């Protein structure tokens, strides 16, 4: 079964060759500018990668993990990701000993390229095997998905998003095949998919549970299924994340907090010594009261400077400052987010602040210089909405829309990561070509060919437009 999945079919080869050629060019675009710095053997790899790598808001933490293994990711959100990369780290250690250079860029690029290739193949096969489109139509949908700006960037950036896209599409494909045969997902399939998907990015594990719900219907709520497929795997992942935090992270966090507390205490002592040496006040109580006011004013100025930095200034007000809820945002404009970021930057890069990071040097909202960008955005949204209507009787489409709805609740509703919502594009963008596929499937003759041609032209435009901006910016 797996060999059949891995093997590239004869009618897929041309599309795959074109896709690989394009991806190799884009990987070279990311590797070349940083090679002279990242290939050197150094003592502080983490600082080196974080200081130099700058592709939008993507983090080069995978470079850190593969070079000098640590649980560099947020262990609650990505509990297994560092462990998945451990074999790659061992290979890199061997190559570093043999060659005397850090091969991290090439090794990570191989992982990303394989993930991208099979995500591309899965999108094609969803079109052909599940929607029953032609090979040509399915290829157009797959190229459309990867033409989206932040799917393209996810495919070439050392972050987790392209791995998540591959796993989500694998879940959709396997679940779709099972539903087409009127069979539910097997328990072991759901458990394995959940562990892998949630292990890479915790919230995507919920999509596996939604897939299980769609494949089983009411049987999903059977106590045995809830215990074996939902409760035990979720408890295992969460417990592993807690163990991972205590084992690998807690000590460094406590040390950092202690250093910060000591630094503030030392600064206060230094200020007090300077104040007491220069003040004309003689009364010790009066000195203490005046210094307390000076220190309060000083700390207020420090905090004001800290929170005026883009990392904080570009974040809205959270629902609460409690853990997890402090990632939410209730004040950032939803309308501008939808127009300029969710269906804007996610799909078409802006001409200004290209590949800039909202935490460093990019405003939350940027407008396009050309009206054609808004026209293309409008066409894609119309095709998407038309596809939802055309596929309204498709169980597969509603399952994928439930995945999309989950992301929209998190990002648009609760505001999780809303100030850079486009970074998460790979988690949900597949729903657009899938819905357009439903629209194509519902049509016949000239109208079907016209919609396919329009989709192909949009994909070609986005490939050229986004690729050119990336190449000339880097």
Features from the language model and the residues they span:
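Transmembrane alpha-helix segments characteristic
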Residues: 139-142, 394-411
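Transmembrane-helix signature of polytopic, membrane-embedded enzymes
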Residues: 123-147, 398
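Lumenal/periplasmic acceptor-binding loop at the mouth of the active site in multi-pass
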Residues: 60-106, 289-384, 397-400
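Membrane-interface alpha helices of multi-pass inner-membrane proteins
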Residues: 185-204, 208-216, 229-235, 457
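Short acidic/glycine- and proline-prone juxtamembrane loop motifs at membrane-interface regions
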Residues: 156-161
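Transmembrane-helix motifs of polytopic, lipid-linked glycan transferases
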Residues: 110-131, 383-386
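Specific aromatic-rich, kink-prone transmembrane helix
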Residues: 163-180, 435
């Amino acid at each position: 079964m797996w060999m059949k999945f891995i093997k590239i079919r004869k009618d897929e080869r041309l599309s795959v060759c074109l896709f690989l050629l394009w991806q190799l060019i884009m990987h070279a675009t990311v590797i070349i500018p940083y090679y002279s710095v990242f290939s050197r053997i150094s003592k502080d790899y983490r600082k080196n990668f974080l200081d130099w790598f700058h592709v939008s808001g993507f983090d080069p933490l995978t470079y850190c993990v593969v070079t000098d293994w640590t649980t560099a990711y947020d262990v609650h959100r990505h509990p297994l990701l560092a462990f998945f990369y451990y074999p790659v780290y061992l290979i890199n250690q061997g190559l570093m000993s043999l060659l005397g250079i850090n091969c991290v860029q090439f090794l990570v690029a191989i992982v990303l390229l394989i993930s991208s290739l099979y995500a591309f193949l899965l999108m094609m096969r969803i079109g052909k095997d599940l929607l029953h489109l032609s090979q040509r139509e399915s290829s157009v949908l797959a190229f459309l998905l990867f033409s989206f700006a932040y799917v393209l960037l996810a495919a070439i950036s050392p972050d987790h998003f392209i791995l998540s896209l591959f796993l989500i599409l694998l879940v959709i494909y396997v679940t779709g095949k099972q539903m087409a045969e009127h069979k539910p997902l097997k328990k072991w399939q759901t458990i394995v998919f959940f562990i892998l998907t949630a292990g890479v990015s915790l919230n995507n594990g919920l999509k596996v549970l939604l897939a299980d719900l769609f494949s089983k219907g009411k049987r999903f709520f059977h106590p045995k299924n809830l215990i074996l497929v939902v409760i035990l795997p979720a408890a295992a992942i969460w417990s592993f994340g807690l163990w991972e935090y205590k084992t690998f992270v807690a000590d460094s966090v406590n040390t950092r907090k202690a250093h910060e507390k000591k630094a503030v205490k030392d600064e206060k002592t230094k200020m007090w010594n300077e104040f007491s040496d220069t003040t004309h006040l003689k009364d010790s109580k009066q000195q203490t009261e005046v210094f307390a006011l000076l220190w309060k004013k000083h700390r207020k100025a420090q905090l004001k400077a800290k929170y005026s930095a883009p990392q904080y200034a570009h974040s809205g007000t959270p629902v609460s400052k409690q853990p997890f809820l402090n990632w939410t945002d209730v004040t950032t404009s939803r309308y501008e987010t939808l127009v300029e970021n969710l269906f804007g930057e996610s799909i078409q890069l802006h001409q200004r602040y290209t590949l800039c990071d909202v935490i460093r040097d990019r405003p939350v909202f940027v407008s396009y210089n050309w009206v054609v960008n808004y026209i293309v955005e409008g066409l894609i949204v119309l095709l998407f909405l038309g596809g939802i209507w055309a596929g309204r009787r498709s169980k597969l489409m509603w399952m994928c829309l439930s995945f999309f709805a989950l992301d929209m609740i998190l990002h648009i509703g609760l505001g999780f990561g809303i100030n850079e919502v486009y970074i998460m594009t790979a988690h949900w963008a597949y729903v657009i070509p899938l819905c357009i596929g439903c629209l194509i499937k519902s049509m016949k003759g000239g109208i079907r060919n016209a919609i396919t041609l329009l989709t192909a032209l949009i994909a070609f435009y986005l490939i050229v437009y986004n690729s050119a901006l990336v190449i000339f910016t880097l």
